[in-house]
């Protein structure tokens, strides 16, 4: 059989196809069953009947038929009996298994009532012509959650609902600074001024990559450059040439420069200073066209800040209550696979966002001086916390017997459609009913925790 498969793969270029690796071993046929191997781990054994296998074999053959070559037949017109005689039906098994396996596996999981939380490792136990196929799947199941107190929790939060006059003034001042204009300054540069410079950096007299810039605008005191650089330009005037001597931090991302002394020959082209508008009614109207006076702006900003502070306070209470409910619970042997999958999901989401901004993974790691491992480590602690939180909230929803009604699902769809400005039908096509139900019961569980919590 192996030589016939090899012959078939050569005829079809089969090595380029992405197929499940099949591991054959002899065993007696079994019905669907589950064998515990360790806490939250076990093996499912299940069968696939011939009435499922035959259509899958037909699909597998039709998929590759157009590429088949054999003497006496035009390409793509080899009859199935000739194919079976020449290569053997067995060479279709891998493709057929890819077709039929997902549904068969899901059916076995459902029949056994298992809550699987990671990708299974599939092995083929028995795969013989004309007989049902028997497979096994090593699976990781959701851990048991022993709930502690989650109602009437008393929490401490480092947040306040109060908004002071200083908070309002600070918001207006930020807007005032945003409206500032840079004007040429005839005199020495001071902290807060912007200088337009050329610079060339060297270490031991040798220029290095990334150490050169032309017409660069640098705000003194902004911390854009390494420590000590900006301070040495204070007092400089347009036309000056300044030798800036600094030492790269030991933690500098470019390892070949970390901890080394460097010299930057710097030419000052311009010194600019901020011209900030007067704090008056005209400024208020420039900031917000819906107000007429500075006092009107203060009233409006106070309301906005109070609303934001209220939301931040409620979020802090909710976060503290959920964190305490999670701490009060016991999760029995949390599988590492759940953490790994959550880390991978977070990393993939982050890198996807970077690529949408035109930053490839290679470029990101080069710019930040980090590695793929660093990024995974960065998300590990948060992933652990997020997985535990989700498990506890799910357990609370189950303990409370929460369900999602049809009207609640419809309301959730409409809310999401409004939030993301898309048709409700599009939301339905993107999210399954099970996903919507899960979100709704999770919200109900969170409400139980937070609505009964109080602040110390």
Curated annotation (Swiss-Prot):
Catalyzed chemical reaction(s): [protein]-peptidylproline (omega=180) = [protein]-peptidylproline (omega=0)
Q: Which taxonomic lineage is given here?
A: Bacteria, Bacillati, Bacillota, Bacilli, Lactobacillales
Q: Which UniProt keywords apply?
A: Cell cycle, Cell division, Chaperone, Cytoplasm, Isomerase, Rotamase
Query: Mind telling me which InterPro entries this protein's record contains?
Result: PPIase_dom_sf, PPIase_FKBP_dom, Trig_fac, Trigger_fac_C, Trigger_fac_C_sf, Trigger_fac_ribosome-bd_bac, Trigger_fac_ribosome-bd_sf, Trigger_fact/SurA_dom_sf
Question: What family does the database annotate?
Answer: Belongs to the FKBP-type PPIase family. Tig subfamily.
* Pfam families in the cross-refs: FKBP_C, Trigger_C, Trigger_N
Q: What processes in GO biological process is this protein linked to? A: 'de novo' cotranslational protein folding; cell division; chaperone-mediated protein folding; protein transport; protein unfolding
- Which Gene Ontology MF annotations are present? peptidyl-prolyl cis-trans isomerase activity; protein folding chaperone; ribosome binding
Could you state one GO cellular component term attached to this entry? cytoplasm
Protein name, per record: Trigger factor
Occurrences of domain PPIase FKBP-type (ranges): 192-277
